[in-house]
Amino acid sequence: VDWTIRRWPENLGRRCKLELGVVGEVRATLEALLPKLTEKRNSAFLQASLAHYREARQGLDDLARGTPGRKPIHPQYLAKVVSDLAAPDAIFTADVGTPTVWAARYLKMNGRRRLLGSFVHGSMANAMAHALGAQAANRARQVISLSGDGGFTMLMGDLITLTQENLPVKVVIFNNGVLGFVALEMKAAGFVDFGVDLNNPDFAAMARAMGVHSRRVEDPGELAGALEEILAHPGPAVLDVVTASQELSLPPNITAEQIKEFSLFVLRAIMSGRGDSVVDLVKTNLLPR
């Protein structure tokens, strides 16, 4: 039986399939449960879990691909390339929203790397602020901010702080032109997304105007080279990556209600003249990468 321990009962089963829910503090609950458990050497559950992980991992890795010339860049591929090229002891910070999803799924942690985020409070624009603090406290370590374009534009004045304090933070921007997680929540609730599109400037050009080394990438074939250049730069640097705006970050389990509401979104989008966005969504998520 899969046990799920949550401090707040309303969170039980919110994101994962629930078999047995327990309400309480994790430490106190485990301390109460452990004396009542007997050791088992049957590894059937472990092997089943490992098999499930390998299958899920393969599915995620299949999405993290980029073909030169095939635009736009998929955010999964960007996160994977960042993980592959980052230092073994890098400190990552992730904005609330889809950057947190891509960081959780594609950054390979090894016991030396750290991942910081606003995982409980859920405040936007946290990535650069966290990166500033992490770099100030660890000037010898590589610090990479995984910023969404929405979060970045909220506090992009922090770029001036990077230059003023000479903090060599590397800012990687997932520039998809939309508040992606909010748009996805609207679609999952059956609504045609509105008020979420962003008319972004060229962030790389803007960073250069502030005296920050920068690159802008739109082609998957140029991504690795550009990121290597950014990471090798001795000072602060910005990598503005144009990513797919219609990428779906699906939860581990999808309910029948979610399928119904998403189908309702598709119908409403077509009837309201937004059929082109539905076509783009299908192409982004179903065509070869």
Model-predicted segments: where are they?
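Secondary-structure boundary motif
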Residues: 39, 84, 88, 136, ...
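Short hydrophobic segments within beta-strands
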Residues: 1, 93-95, 146, 172
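Thiamine diphosphate
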Residues: 14-16, 21-23, 30-33, 101-289
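A short, charged, Gly/Pro-tolerant segment at domain boundaries
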Residues: 49-58, 244-246, 255
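Active-site diphosphate/adenylate-binding microenvironment
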Residues: 54-129, 134
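Glycine-rich, acidic loop regions that bind phosphate or pyrophosphate groups
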Residues: 1-51, 227, 231
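Short coil/turn segments at secondary-structure boundaries
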Residues: 45-49, 95-96, 241
